[in-house]
A protein has these predicted regions:
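Conserved tyrosine-mediated DNA breakage-rejoining catalytic core shared by Y-recombinases
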Residues: 159-218
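Short, polar N-cap/turn motifs at the start of nucleic acid-interacting alpha helices
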Residues: 165-166, 282-284, 301-327
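Short basic/aromatic active-site micro-motif
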Residues: 252-256, 271-301, 310, 314
Length: 390
């Protein structure tokens, strides 16, 4: 007979889930097993036996167990968490070829709900400035990157040194050596705005986004520090970072811990909780809130929702996703127009956003606009002539 751990490990391995999903699924299945007072193997054997005996669904213990568990979760958890737990349990049964027929619908009346997170819950620029000021080099770079790129923590953690070299290639002549690339970028007279061609782990959707020069400079400082530490570590045969190394060296658990430490140090508290129903809130300074900050502030400074969705790797609808492809340079121009919204340490008046590429792009846009205006004027003249107005 397999233990709970063995069943969970086999279940997770065949589905190819991430470390974070592994922990979530493991906790949920343990929660279900404890509620039922049986091991997962005993629950599977019971369901399998009932199925082989041809017992009708409405009389099966499995239906009663799932219904009872659903009601328990609804009464003790938020409605979204309750639905997620039941979904995981059903997936587990399906994975072991156990049939599950129709269950009673979730009764959402009087269900526990979180208070909505509102714009006032987002950390303001001054708070983020304080956070960056007191943070260690890794967190300085990470905060500025997440705020200005809008990437999720999962996608940011997946980035490699090679991804960084690719994103900044035009600033270091496509150098494949990190130290050489950093040297050239530090000598570059202008703003370094990387172009990230990435893919969301959550949806497998490819997307393009950018980050600010201040984020790039702090990433460079952080990478130099890591290389320096590698050089001083005599027990490590590796003396510099390679293309396959992670851009941000931080585990999923440590990621949350470091943000919570900063949140607590700044006394930011939580958001989205509901004390009356004993629902704890989320820390205000966390990766997802920085993603919200990115979207909210780009919109505040003139960027449309469609473009924001593109930068965050979100869908703009099935038809748009299939038939419309976003041009990197056009997106970059839109990003630079709204960049003030995601600058944390730099005032926009001091920000030389007119890089050589941008100046060229702006000039071409002006010339294009002049041509359009001229054509429009000519069309209007022809219309008047046709009507006999001239």
């Amino acid at each position: 007979m397999s233990t709970n751990q063995e069943l969970v490990d086999e279940f997770i391995a065949t589905r190819g889930l991430s470390k974070a999903s592994y922990k979530s699924f493991k906790y949920t299945l343990k929660h279900y097993s404890n509620f039922q007072g049986c091991s997962l193997q005993e629950l599977l054997d019971e369901a399998d036996y009932e199925e082989e005996q041809g017992i009708r669904w409405k009389k099966r213990k499995l239906k009663q167990r799932l219904t009872n568990y659903m009601n328990f979760c609804r009464n003790t958890l938020t409605i979204n968490t309750a639905k997620h737990y039941l979904k995981v349990v059903k997936i587990f049964y399906h994975h072991h070829d156990i049939e599950i027929h129709k269950l009673p619908p979730f009764n959402e009346r009087n269900a526990k709900v979180r208070n909505p997170i509102t714009p006032k819950d987002l950390p303001i620029r001054e708070i983020l400035q304080e956070a960056v000021e007191i943070a260690e080099p890794l967190m300085k770079a990470l905060i500025l990157f997440l705020v200005s790129s809008g990437m999720s923590k999962v996608d940011a953690r997946n980035l490699t040194i090679q991804n960084f070299l690719d994103a900044t290639s035009k600033y270091h002549n496509n150098s494949e050596d990190l130290k050489t690339a950093i040297k050239l970028m530090k000598e570059y007279d202008g703003e370094i705005i990387p172009i990230w061609n990435s893919r969301r782990q959550k949806t497998n959707k490819f997307f393009v986004t950018f980050n600010t020069d201040e984020a790039t400079r702090h990433i460079i400082s952080y990478l130099e520090l890591r290389n320096e530490r590698l050089n001083k570590n005599f027990y490590n045969p590796k003396n510099e970072l390679g293309p396959s190394d992670k851009l941000f060296k931080i585990g999923v658990d440590y990621f949350s811990v470091k943000f919570k430490e900063l949140n607590d140090t700044l006394n930011l508290g939580t958001a989205g909780g509901n004390p009356e129903e004993n629902i704890k809130g989320f820390t205000r300074l966390r990766a997802h809130m920085l993603r919200k900050y990115h979207a909210t502030n780009l919109k505040k400074f003139g960027m449309d929702t469609y473009t924001i969705n593109v930068l965050q790797g979100k869908s703009n609808g099935a038809v748009n996703d299939v038939y419309f492809f976003e041009d990197e340079e056009t997106l970059l121009a839109e990003y630079i127009k709204a960049i003030e919204g995601v600058l944390i340490l730099t005032d926009v008046k001091d920000y030389n956003r007119y890089s050589p590429e941008y100046i060229k792009m702006e000039k071409e846009n002006e010339e294009y606009k002049e041509k359009i205006d001229k054509i429009t004027d000519e069309i209007n003249v022809l219309k008047k002539m046709y009507r006999g107005e001239t």
